[in-house]
């Protein structure tokens, strides 16, 4: 039997883009990267675990903020090169800016307009004890 992780077309860095969506509304919350280990751990632990390219290590979503993403479903696209995670976003904040989604800007009249409010000050999110 073929390993399910072998079916994924990893990029030259051994990564695959992963899009987190709210499992109830379908809203796109964020995009991050996963490597083989982070995807396997995500499936095993039923929570989103990404690969931080800037830190060069596993990133358990919510480990600092408390805003864990509980996994409901994993999906692989037709080309096998993008993952979608259907998640329950604990705390309703996915973005490090304190917003529900990282996609809070809309292109309008030649510029990016902020359309989603900050739900919690990022300084308060990432301080001790969240």
Swiss-Prot record:
Binding, Mg(2+): 77, 79, 81
EC number: 3.5.4.19
Annotated Zn(2+) binding sites: 78, 95, 102
Top class in the EC scheme: hydrolase
The protein's required cofactors: Mg(2+); Zn(2+)
Highest taxon of source: Bacteria
Keywords of this entry: Amino-acid biosynthesis, Cytoplasm, Histidine biosynthesis, Hydrolase, Magnesium, Metal-binding, Zinc
This protein's GO CC annotations: cytoplasm
Entry function: Catalyzes the hydrolysis of the adenine ring of phosphoribosyl-AMP.
Name used for this protein in its record: Phosphoribosyl-AMP cyclohydrolase
Gene: hisI
């Amino acid at each position: 039997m073929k390993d399910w992780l072998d079916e994924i077309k990893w990029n030259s860095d051994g990564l695959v883009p992963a899009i987190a969506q709210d499992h109830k509304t379908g809203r796109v919350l964020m995009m991050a990267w996963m490597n083989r280990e982070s995807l396997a751990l995500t499936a095993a632990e039923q929570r989103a675990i990404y690969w931080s390219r800037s830190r060069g290590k596993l990133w358990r979503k919510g480990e600092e903020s408390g805003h864990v993403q509980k996994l409901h479903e994993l999906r692989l696209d037709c080309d096998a090169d993008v993952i979608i995670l259907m998640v329950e976003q604990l705390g309703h904040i996915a973005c490090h800016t304190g917003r529900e989604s990282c996609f809070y800007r809309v292109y309008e009249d030649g510029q990016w307009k902020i359309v989603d409010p900050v739900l919690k000050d990022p300084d308060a999110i990432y301080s001790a004890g969240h």
